[in-house]
Every structure is written in C-alpha cells, then in structure tokens.
Curated annotation (Swiss-Prot):
GO biological process, one term: translation
NCBIfam families: L27 (TIGR00062)
Protein known as: Large ribosomal subunit protein bL27
Gene name linked to the record: rpmA
Residue ranges of coiled coil: none
UniProt similarity note: Belongs to the bacterial ribosomal protein bL27 family.
Annotated HAMAP family: Ribosomal_bL27
Matching Pfam families: Ribosomal_L27 (PF01016)
UniProtKB keywords: Ribonucleoprotein, Ribosomal protein
Region described as Disordered: 1-25
GO molecular function terms noted in the UniProt entry: structural constituent of ribosome
Gene Ontology CC: cytosolic large ribosomal subunit
UniProt xrefs under PROSITE patterns: RIBOSOMAL_L27
Claim: Metal-binding is one of the keywords in the record: no
Length: 87
C-alpha cells in the first residue's frame, strides 16, 4: 500500500448531495391534505393542529387549509387552520 500520494492524485474531490431541507409552505399559504410543509432533521418545528410528523421528522398537512406558524410552550409549531366550510 502506498502511503504517499502518487503523481496527479488528490485526497479531495468528494462531496455529498444537498438534502433539500427547509420550509416548503409558508405562513398564509393554502395547502391540501398530504402536502409537505417542512423537511427537517430533528424537530426544529413541532406539529400542531392538523399537522402530522413522518418518520424522518417531516411535517405534513392532515387536512386542507391555511398554514400558520406559532409557538406553544416555547416551541415553534406549525398549524393548519381549516378553510371556512362552504354552505
């Protein structure tokens, strides 16, 4: 095994692909059930009303409505406010 670099070799040249994390739907936007709201590692945002959490901590809408960001007990939460039912 060579312990020195050979001619024109390098120890660099590797990088991982971006994970495309972050908020996907912002406050006030209307969403339908099942839409992804936040992609995250860990629970930076916690699920609130009408919001579910996936196995990779992704937050998604459980019902249609408008996105609302807020806090509860010092934690950032994401809620879905249902649209007014039409009569």
């Amino acid at each position: 095994m060579a312990h020195k670099k050979g001619a024109s070799s390098s120890r660099n040249g590797r990088d991982s692909n971006a994970q495309r994390l972050g908020v996907k739907r912002f406050g006030g936007q209307s969403v339908s059930a099942g839409e992804i709201l936040v992609r995250q590692r860990g629970t930076h945002f916690h699920p609130g009303v009408n919001v579910g959490r996936g196995g990779d901590d992704t937050l998604f809408a459980l019902s249609a409505g408008a996105v609302e960001f807020g806090t509860k007990r010092g934690r950032k939460t994401v809620n879905i406010v249902p649209a007014a039912a039409e009569v």
